[in-house]
Amino acid sequence: MNRLKSVVIAAVLLAVTTVASAVDMSKPTGTGTLTITNISIGSDGTTLDFEGPVENYGTVFATHYLQSVDGDRARGIVTGQARAMLNDGGMVVTPHHGTFTRSGSSLQIYFTDATNTGVVNFVVWDADVLTKKVSLKYWEVKSVD
């Protein structure tokens, strides 16, 4: 009986910890607006370059490589890098890994980053390749230790 009680208490503590560390997707940690500055088309994928201001990160410069996983190029994988030049002169560096979907000229890019400062973010970009405008939101899922 004591073992069952211990298992139940452990399960409740695990559930409470999981809920407590859940990310509230209705409240992003920050937002930003980027501009697509270059698009390079290749036989196996497309490279896009971006720059613009992002809340808490100063000016961001990023490159993403999009590779389709289907014939109509409506979804696929994203890999990339970003450099953020902070307002105090510091720099944050991070790789990007995720997925994308496309509908017409609209791209939705979803990825995680793992910054050199120890912060991990989940990031969503809504981009239009015709207007070259990108709006983004990010959620901090792991803060600095």
Model-assigned labels for residue ranges:
Residues 1-8:
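Bacterial N-terminal signal peptides that target proteins for export
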Residues 8-10, 20:
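Cleavable N-terminal signal peptides
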Residues 15-18:
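N-terminal signal peptide c-region/cleavage motif recognized by signal peptidases
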Residues 21-145:
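Beta-strand-enriched cores of mature, soluble protein domains
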